[in-house]
């Protein structure tokens, strides 16, 4: 064992030679690599670059003088630089030494008594740390002896295994663990002192003595990044600012983060005091209150030196009085501050923001406070502070939530605010963000009313919403937080308080329920946030119909829709789909004409517009009343004058003006058995013509008088046309006479209808093609129309006795697809080429048909095709 001990400790005269035993050399090589890697890893933990042993040796020779004291400190520097390498190297030998009872060697570590070594061996200590372990000088015998020391770190008595020269004193340690802990503590202390700007108080030499490693790094021109606190070489640094504010960042990423942080803070500082008074003071005060600067974005808004001296944040300095509350937490430790900064998110205080300030506030910034009440979970002493409903939320996520909340409050609280503060010039709901913050008028203090709390606390929200004082009488109370958007369904127009822009008002109904899900907004985000507004703009489809059907009492007896059953109304309704709504004047004319017509003819076709108008517009409604049905048989409500008896069984409603209704007039023939040969009177033919060529209805409309007697025949003819095939041909016949006759004129000459008899066959084929087109255009009709037809069909059920009759309700809903499936056929609006010349008004139908396909929907089209096939 003695030999091994000697081998492990080469004599001093052999220090310059490599170890005699190759095994020893291998171990030393391995340990050297291990030491270098371990030290580099340790340095990496503290943000230092890795150090090459040879490079370090050269640097040391260049950087320090060679006097005894400097060498002594150089030795310490090396010890600090590579504490582990020496330990493992000697620990390899230590087993032998310890086994022989020579424990002193293990404790020496070759550097433990570096001061003595430097005295005894001249320049040797300078190179000892950086040369391979074999060259490490073993401690002198007196040094190697079991020296009992009190560990400088754990304060326990033990064998001295490490010593660290701290300039004027030498600290001894009983174990590697204590040595590393002490070194780490000094490193942190010196780094913090340097960051605090106290470096000027400590000369460089002092650092060299106290923490040689730090001096070594400074000499190498390695600086600490002002953002990430990592050490990079100066050539990689980016300078930002000048003078005292000059900062250095290790990468563009750090610089950008710093700029973004400053941008956030400046933006918030410019907001009114009430909005962001507490946004940053808490964070900055916390971070600054701790001895060590907390690495949070908020701490870098200002120069490092100023940030450490300044307690109030720039926002607080702007005149915000909220700072004191947050400052109470300034003494928390760095870890605490990290948590607090997230958990205690300051919220704007509505009471501190007078309405007068709002005009200058960007819309987004103003609204967040509006919906934010004093945080519920915050102690009373610091009302401005708020914890999110979900507990501590990471700052980035919280910011996004804030943005969402900021956009929502205008809609949630906007109406209440407007109701309570109608005189506010900015109360226009169109710009929710511009209006005075709802919170402003309420001036709610820390003891926020339920109005504010509902947004913050789902627990309080449901009970408080019904009694929200600010809600306008028309507004529905916000649904409980659980309900997604129960109140969003289109509110009546009357419920929208501020007429100019009802949409935001509508938003108010549903959005309050969302508020509890999102923490109150407290941050102003400098970038635009596109927030989809869930505004279901409820444009009731019947609205256009309502406007057209406004003629008196012109609602179908079905009552399902607003489409009037009166001829004028039906024409108007038909016009709506087609886009050619009759003017009230026309509808009135139609009603008056119908009134003038004999009672028997009241159900018959009425032309609402004058003949010229009819030709110009295909707005004429042709109603052919079944002759068999009494004038009063109509189940529908006529105009006040009783003009229409729409419900009559035989009435066929053709709205020439609207492609949807005229072209799409699909009448359900109760019985497909219609005799095409039947051509009773000219009036009947005209009626047929009107039905077939819905565009030619004007003449039919003009038939009221004659049509009464011929009503039955006309109905049959029309039914024939509706049924298709031969009936259609006859319809074409009848259609010719009407073309140019004004609606008022009496029955057109029967001869032209006869002429049309010849084209009966082509008319049928044409009818087939037209049916398809008509179906397409009819597909355009709304589900409402179908419903109407169904209702009308039910009404007409009593009159179904006549096989040729179409549903009386079909007047208004000639195009109702549901009714067709039985035997009904689409009346072809497009006349044959031969007929077109005679039927100028009929020509109008073609453009309407062309327009029809735009609106048609595939399902409806399929249905129309099905109906056509059945009719065939």
Curated annotation (Swiss-Prot):
GO molecular function, one term: zinc ion binding
Domain of life: Eukaryota
The entry's keywords: Isopeptide bond, Metal-binding, Phosphoprotein, Repeat, Ubl conjugation, Zinc, Zinc-finger
Gene Ontology BP annotations: animal organ development; inner ear morphogenesis
Region Disordered, annotated ranges: 1-26, 308-354, 411-484, 550-619, 728-770
Motif (SUMO interaction motif 2 (SIM)): 651-655
Bias (Basic and acidic residues) ranges: 1-14
Biased composition, class Pro residues, residue ranges: 460-484, 736-753
Biased composition (Low complexity): 417-433
Disulfide bond residue pairs: none
The family this protein is said to belong to: Belongs to the SOBP family.
Subunit comment: Interacts (via SIM domains) with SUMO1 and SUMO2.
UniProt-recorded name of the protein: Sine oculis-binding protein homolog
